[in-house]
Amino acid sequence: MKKTVEDRSLEFLIRRRNDAELPPLASLSCKHLKQHHWRDAFDDEQAALREQLWAVKTQLDVIPAETYTATRNKLFPLAASGEQRNFSNRAGHKLLESMESTGVWMELSKLLRGKSTKRPRDFAFADVCGGPGAFSQALFQAGRKRGWRHLHGYGMTLAGVSGLDWYAHLLKSPQFTCTYGLDGTGDIFKLSNIDCLASITKAAPMFLVVADGGFNVDFSVTNYQETISSRIMYGQWLAALKLLRKGGCFVLKLFDTFSPLSRAVLYLSCCMYRRVHVAKPRHSRVVNSERYLVCVDFLGYPSEGWSRYLDSFYEVGFVDNEHVPQLIPREWCLQDAVFMADVRDMNTAVATNQVIALQMILDAAPAMTEELKAKTIEKKPAAGSDDGRTPPPDEGGDGE
């Protein structure tokens, strides 16, 4: 009997050895960073699992987009862009589910109330690369439900890009402040723009940073979405380190976690936050590689040397969008047995479910093709009809 899966929430704790010393990050130099093209920016860690996943993804290439979407939505109803009474898309649901499953709400409540029984103190959040604002929209609504009436949001996103600028109601809200950085572009690839956002929020009680940045990649290179997205992933992660107050939390969207850079970011996160999770929320399709890094209780930089190196790495390491630099020696991660066991377990669980889900689509696609053909024939006007009317389009398409 063939295996089946369904959309459901998964959550994984990522730890490092309790007795492990902090890695000597400040001793590293950015003068001679190793660079790899995004096609070659993987190593042999869990290579068999990654290649198995890629092989199944590649088999989908022959399935027409309409057939794939219809099959996916039939097998996995949560994949359809429904349940949108509160948010304009599913991104808000995924953020709130990730925060709920990893205890972020509880942590923020403790942080804001302390020992006081009075109303919680004010706090702010930053929405990085978040346009048009689904995350901010979700946070404002969740804040109202929890009685956080004085919540203030700050946002930075690319300027002048259709579909990415903030929702009009956010721009008009006195509770939301947007910036496009020092140069007015909102480009997070420029460290000066991140520093500008940090300067604007310096006096704010910044206890939450969320980051949903990414971009669509061509269908022919979807297997490399993780490494193609390396620069924006690192930039958002670095922004959180600059923006958060101690005790704050961070949520970042990721695509796969197989590459050495993703592994290094997870490892260093374990050094700078009390608790680190990877969440796969229920509304994040089981058929895709998306997941969320959730970091709880920011401890701060261990030293100024860490801050200088991580800044310099961003400016010097990413020479273009084609190459991925080496952040830390890979041995630093591999020699920590606790960390590697957690990462391998997480990758195995998410990728295995994804392979099963994609195989379910491959198996069901032929029947869906015939079903769609039959519907097309039914919609054609009878021979000799002269009413000139065009049948209405199918409903239920995925708007994302």
From Swiss-Prot:
Residues 373-400 are annotated as: Disordered. Coiled coil: none annotated. It comes from the Eukaryota. Keywords: Methyltransferase, mRNA capping, mRNA processing, S-adenosyl-L-methionine, Transferase. Its EC number is 2.1.1.57. The keyword Transferase applies. The active site is at 253 (proton acceptor). It is an enzyme of class 2 (transferase). Residues 86-299 form the RrmJ-type SAM-dependent 2'-O-MTase domain. PROSITE patterns: SAM_MT_RRMJ (PS51613). It catalyses: a 5'-end (N(7)-methyl 5'-triphosphoguanosine)-ribonucleoside in mRNA + S-adenosyl-L-methionine = a 5'-end (N(7)-methyl 5'-triphosphoguanosine)-(2'-O-methyl-ribonucleoside) in mRNA + S-adenosyl-L-homocysteine + H(+). S-adenosyl-L-methionine-dependent methyltransferase that mediates RNA cap1 2'-O-ribose methylation to the 5'-cap structure of RNAs. Methylates the ribose of the first nucleotide of a m(7)GpppG-capped mRNA to produce m(7)GpppNmp (cap1). This is Cap-specific mRNA (nucleoside-2'-O-)-methyltransferase 1. It comes from Leishmania major.
